[in-house]
């Protein structure tokens, strides 16, 4: 490609509305341009990277035995009503009607469509297992699009769906997809972790996220310092304290605390260790629970894990915290005065709370707390569960090492769906025994556009992007100095350009009438890994200046050796 026939569209200044590095660099490097909130056009440089991501994904999916298909982005509403997600999915699902007043959705995902397709096309267990994938634009009506294409409303996704007649068959495909995803992100040169995850609104029995480590990530991921254990913080188990509960050392007493409405105020005013305090949170109960609210209790220095709380059998989903009005109606006191003593609601406490002694908690009366509370002396031990978020330094759930927490960008997610969709949509095949058998499903997604974001977040410096070799829009940039004035420079540049193209290398020849400083800055910004500077002086010794974008290394290389050198460098990096 020649810059004279290309739209480079680089920017010198950082756009004011770009918050994270990837958004800033994608705009400055001429990769994307905003059309409306959460909607972006992909310019040539960005699209070249996007296509390279797609190609790697496609190759590995094909290698794993998946079959590529293409399904409509517009989907009939009745399929979503049949699966039950018409209501469950909420306002992120863009709904509309056509001129015939028929209801449709703009697809955020395709479980319903693929299930409908397979129930009409596959009739026997002999045709299974099958795994289908597509790479397609999706739409989710995000309430607050942000960070460029990291969280946009329209995005490109690879979604795959597998169909089976047994859990063992599903597990085999799930494992194959796990390995394929690991190969995909390894080929892309990304530092990532595969972590246990919650199944969320997709549903199912097992799930792993593939998280690229980045400080700007939206997720907290947890992993062991001494083993392969890794999980999303929502799912990470907080191991029960090893130490037994200490014997009571104080009598329980009622204390006036009119100015202590928070844990921080209580600790400051009474010089209490925060580890000797508890937080009591009220959430709405299931309709059949017998009480309108359920009380959940964690230690004062810990935080409730909403995902764990929502999985309690007596807690309503989605998790909803009680309003102050509901709290006062149920307990007779405000949120800052809640505690376990004489609480007229069912109570579930975290494992760490179960081993506490001589602790302080609200007295369920305005401006009062009990100090010196002890389980089984002052009140019976209630239901105990894992309720809290883990913290750095906790013991790893597998018993090996301690936990570290880092931020991550989710780029892939695989699920064992089981029969959630096939049961709802009556997707069956004739089993080996001749009877109808409900299909067992898996689904496997990769955010193609998010991969581009994650790669930039992990690979940049103060001059621009440092693309991994496999994702770079161009592998080589040829920068001829004054080629429009020097026939020799132009001839060498053109010859090199033709040779590199013939060897299958993506090369950009900068044939603009621009100052060298502008040419260098643009190539640094868009992140071309290998740069060749051709000048009259160096051609006197038949040499070219080579610069490696990532390492900054510069060296002179003989003109006769440069093509083989680049082919070797690129092959090694890939």
UniProtKB/Swiss-Prot annotation:
GO BP annotations, alphabetical order: prolyl-tRNA aminoacylation
Keyword terms of this UniProt record: Aminoacyl-tRNA synthetase, ATP-binding, Cytoplasm, Ligase, Nucleotide-binding, Protein biosynthesis
UniProt cross-references to InterPro entries, sorted A to Z: aa-tRNA-synt_IIb, aa-tRNA-synth_II, aa-tRNA-synth_II/BPL/LPL, Anticodon-bd, Anticodon-bd_dom_sf, Pro-tRNA-ligase_IIa, Pro-tRNA-synth_IIa_bac-type, Pro-tRNA-Synthase_IIa_type1
GO CC annotation terms, alphabetical: cytosol
Domain of life, per lineage: Bacteria
Keyword Signal: no
Main location, first listed in the record: cytoplasm
EC number(s) stated in the UniProt entry for this protein: 6.1.1.15
Subcellular location: Cytoplasm
PROSITE patterns in the record: AA_TRNA_LIGASE_II (PS50862)
One Pfam match: tRNA_edit
Catalyses which reaction(s): tRNA(Pro) + L-proline + ATP = L-prolyl-tRNA(Pro) + AMP + diphosphate
SUPFAM superfamilies associated with the record: Class II aaRS ABD-related (SSF52954), Class II aaRS and biotin synthetases (SSF55681), YbaK/ProRS associated domain (SSF55826)
Subunit structure: Homodimer.
Family: Belongs to the class-II aminoacyl-tRNA synthetase family. ProS type 1 subfamily.
NCBIfam families xrefs: PRK09194.1 (NF006625), proS_fam_II (TIGR00409)
General function of this protein: Catalyzes the attachment of proline to tRNA(Pro) in a two-step reaction: proline is first activated by ATP to form Pro-AMP and then transferred to the acceptor end of tRNA(Pro). As ProRS can inadvertently accommodate and process non-cognate amino acids such as alanine and cysteine, to avoid such errors it has two additional distinct editing activities against alanine. One activity is designated as 'pretransfer' editing and involves the tRNA(Pro)-independent hydrolysis of activated Ala-AMP.
Protein name, per record: Proline--tRNA ligase
Species name: Sodalis glossinidius (strain morsitans)
